[in-house]
Amino acid sequence: MASLFAIGFSKFSPQPTSDYSKLLKVFHPKPYSLKFLFLKTLNPTRFFKVRANDGTEPSDKLQQYFQNQDYDKKYGFLENIDSFTIPKGLSEETIRLISKLKKEPAWILEYRLKAYAKFLKLEEPKWSDNRYPLLDLQDMCFYSAPKKKPTLNSSDIADEADDPKLLEEFDRLDVPLTKKKKCSPKVAVDAVYNSESIAITNKEPLEKSGVIFCSISEAIRKYPDLIKKYLGRVVPSDDNYYAALNTAVFSDGSFCYIPKNTRCPMPLSSYFRMNSIENTGQFERTLIVAEEGSFVEYSEGCTAISHDKNQLHAAVVELYCAEGAEIKYSTRGLCAGDRSKISWTQVEKGFAITWKYPSVVLEGDDSVGEAENARNTSTCDSMLIGDNAAANTYPYIQVKNPSARIEHEASTSKIGEDQIFYFQQRGIDHERALAAMISGFCRDVFNKLPNEFGAEVNQLLSIKLEGSVG
């Protein structure tokens, strides 16, 4: 599966209007506005997401709710980190340079080059009826990394003598790597800055359980047999245009391996930070393998500086779930064994348009498709804020096994002025009224998240954002 989204208005981002005159407006998009699509399924899922902001000025009080600079203070700030960045452009030389910088074995370089050859034969997909400019890959940088990475001690805490700006940036993002804000003992975190994983916390308790949690770059060097066996097994390089692109130029991401009959002792998380004033892409590659009877819970997040230009995050995340295993995550996976299970929970908060293309790979008795009694249920609940908001659901269901049961449910609700008036009559101001209704609407989603992540998402929802058109 490929996950693609724009941070701000990008060259490939869809426009929520067919009026080209609006494309010429001067605007300052922020990386988040409030739009939701929640989908839950017990089977593996696939999603493809594009988010954009057309910079339309707010026209009513509901839209003005989102206008202030809270995002800039919390996530949108820019730190001047001393980094190494390769020249812009995409070519075979670019791919060879990335592989050389990462000191990869020859077989991975060959794997990348084969994907690039497939990519050259594909065309950028033309989605929906929205109009948007084509993506110019030759005007993009495909690798940027800090020159100095943190050094972790035996307690998985960074030495404060390392680049203080880099450590301070993650502290401000509530991803602490130093003694000043000691790492949470409840979650193991892979911190990724632009194109490089810079630190992984709480590795010791994972290693005692036999769990492997490291960057994909480290896994390629240390565990080549596992990578050769599983990389590209769920999402092959020719799956789609952006999957081929990612396979050719992926920089870093997380690798997680849960041995047979092992329960991961803590939730795992990856945090991707994009911090570059240049047109730099982030090409995450994450691979999670759960062997028979194992369990793991994994979440990830991504933030970027507030950017007037475009930034691209094109990710591929593969989940492999063996017989009787369970993975809790939010992307496409393969339930390859009987009674295997993937729980999918996704929270999206961003831009004027959010597109998703969830699909299910069915394979394995009672859990996957080509076998008997498979079942898939997806639910899409949308809340509209303002007179210009819209939510369109286009389910496409194809069943080739008569014993399979596929269900789809969608609902739409809207916050109206009468509801706001009801709150205001009781002394609750406009902003708190909106926050209360949105939080209540999302409660079912929050309850399915670990406590740490549920609180973070709830806090993110409380941020009032500039440039929302909803």
From Swiss-Prot:
InterPro entries: Fe-S_cluster_assembly_SufBD, SUF_FeS_clus_asmbl_SufBD_core, SUF_FeS_clus_asmbl_SufBD_sf, SufBD_N. Transmembrane segments: none annotated. It holds the Pfam family SUFBD_core. GO terms for biological process: iron-sulfur cluster assembly. Belongs to the iron-sulfur cluster assembly SufBD family. This is Iron-sulfur cluster assembly SufBD family protein ABCI9. It comes from Arabidopsis thaliana (Mouse-ear cress). The gene is ABCI9.
